[in-house]
Amino acid sequence: MKGITVLLTAILMLAFSRCNNSKKKSMNEYEKGTYGYDLNFLKEKDKGLIVLKGDNEKAEVIVSPKYQAKVFTSTSNGPDGTSLGFVNHDVLNSDVPDEHMNGYGGENRFWLGPEGGQFSIFFERGREQVFNNWHTPKAIDVEPWDVKEVLSTEVSLAKDMELNNYQGNILKISADRKIKLLSSGQVEQELEVQLPEGINVVAYSTVNKITNLNDFQWDEKTGTVCIWMLDMFNPSDSAATIVPYNVSDEKEPGIIATTGYFGEIPSDRIRYESGILFLKTDGKYRSKLGMNARRTK
């Protein structure tokens, strides 16, 4: 896969499902857990909701300008198919905003750090860094983003923001985000695989960029910001996260993954196999892993 320039990130989300035929139904007939249900629900919350559609009429991706350019959810099998992203209906229905962070959900969402430390953008200068004083910047929590361009399979959004960090500096930032629905052919080309017949696929890439709008450089004195991408999916007993990694010939490529953030991940929940890491993500165990740059693909 092609490399991305500095301050850009690219994410490829994939989901597969067996083909099945479904009759078209009115939106209010879809069951909770289906893509059709979430599409109907989100249209009521964001009148400017954007739906990217593939040429097979089954792959769709929901993007919300109102809710911080989130990819809320997607499907590989049309309205009757499973809604793959986690949509927090209770929070979206609430009339009372959370002063710390509004957990709307989202299959792919733009986030910024650092959350804590001397350059935190989540704490006011001089305030003790405890949860009661922790507040998410509004630009990535409750404010809408601007739509720059919309095509049938891609959308570009942007947001200008000013962030106060723990040093008392105001960091002026322009954030840009492009989301593109990929065809089956593009998936095969990017991943160098042959998709089996009888399989539906939904895949998209996101490219995310931040630009310094200050009249000074960000450095070890002023502080800086970093991009995070946070992804929330609906778990299942068979759900797994697949992470390709480099099988290096170097003498010291480093361990494949750091797996002890919340205690070591049990061996029955993680497996390494010929350059691919498999992590069980059934929602029944909290875990976290990381890879160094020499291992990541």
Regions from the language model: what does each represent?
Residues 1-29:
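Bacterial Sec-dependent N-terminal signal peptides
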Residues 20-205, 209, 213-219, 223-297:
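Surface-exposed acidic/polar loop and edge beta-strand patches at domain peripheries
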